[in-house]
């Protein structure tokens, strides 16, 4: 097999660039409302952080559209705290995206924290008990008023999207694949879109 055949396949049979597109044209896709760009703030880990962000944005007359929040996991918040967090978002027209569970360092095994091999093993869920607890926290967040989730596991994304299509999960719930899942090409983006991702943060 000649590499030239691979190149020709990508050029002629796919919509993917062969190399990096330094001449990238403007996208024809837009956010709701027609904007080509929006402001997303990350690192908001508590209700007090969110309140201060809202105050600062108001003071500077800046519209913040989306907030990447509680990356440490919503399991760290009790129900009252989670509902208050969601209410701040609703009152200020903010799209909140949360991580429903704590990181792999909190799971039932030590692999993730046991050196280089564990670190590169990824942030995916391990075992069906973890998947079960993950889904329970998704439900808890939805009940609290959260409508956006950071996803680090493609299998969980597939299941969640199937549930959204069936109407079990509200259709207005959004799934954004985190950079922690390790995707960084247009091919990855298409894969994640096919699995149900509404957006993703590349490496």
Give the label of every model feature segment.
Residues 52-64:
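A short, Lys/Arg-enriched amphipathic alpha-helix followed by its capping loop at the start of a domain
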Residues 58-60, 142, 193-194:
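Non-catalytic positions within long, well-ordered alpha-helices that form the structural scaffold/packing
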